[in-house]
Amino acid sequence: MELILDQVSHSYGDIEVLSDISLSVGSGEIVCIVGPSGCGKSTLLRILGGLEKPDAGAALIAGDPPADSFNPLTYVFQDFALLPWRTVEGNISLVLEDHSVRKDKARAIIADVLARTKLSEFANAWPRQLSGGMKQRVAIARALSVNPAVMLMDEPLSALDSQTRELLMDDLIELWGQVGFSACYITHNLAEAVRLGHRIVMLSRRPGKIREIVDIDIPLAERINYPAETATIQRRLWEAMRDEARAADRELSDVA
């Protein structure tokens, strides 16, 4: 299944947030969206997921989700949003309860996603007993339990310390190697984007337009072995971000 934005523009009142955005998220592909604060990254994700309708253009779905998918699109946010009165297992089972899944099948699904996210030993733990990184693992396991065609991820690691972020990036890469999931991944962290993205889409300052698209051919699991190449890509993105910031400063000076 493929998600497509076709010449999408969107405004909030008189403020134009996105302008003429066309991009796609293909099967088995992680597309990272980066750009200055306020450039419309989260708005773009909401439009992709059908939570908002664009003022112009269209958000389209091409193809079919997996036959055993309970929900073709699912979100992972910065906020883990775990119910404190449910265990880890109970938080994951919550999203299956509206799908009339047989109890034995639900148990098998939960056991599988717990194993894939390295949470099997914590099935009966309460959210208050978990670190931030463990809570985000639960959120990812919950998203995977419905076997989505595409995960929409809005800064899922930004609330975590740098060491935990590194560990979870390793886990996501390992998980992608097992499952080959598709994702649109919003981040302000360029190192994160270069580590996780098959494609990186940089938006300009508001109104967000596609300034640059960078394809990275190095396999995800091997990028740690190519520090010079990934550093070059990151520097290229950083220079583009810096140019955007300088242009914004000049515009403010002209107004003043």
List PLM regions with ranges.
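Helix-to-loop junction immediately C-terminal to a conserved catalytic motif
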Residues: 49
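Conserved ABC transporter NBD signature motif
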Residues: 57-68
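A short, proline-enriched helix->beta-strand linker immediately N-terminal to the Walker B motif
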Residues: 145-149
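The feature captures the beta-strand-to-loop junction immediately N-terminal to the Walker
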Residues: 34-36
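Conserved ABC ATPase "signature" region
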Residues: 104-122, 173-174
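Conserved ABC ATPase signature
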Residues: 126-130, 134
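Short coil-to-helix segment of the ABC ATPase nucleotide-binding domain corresponding to the Q-loop/switch region
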Residues: 86-93
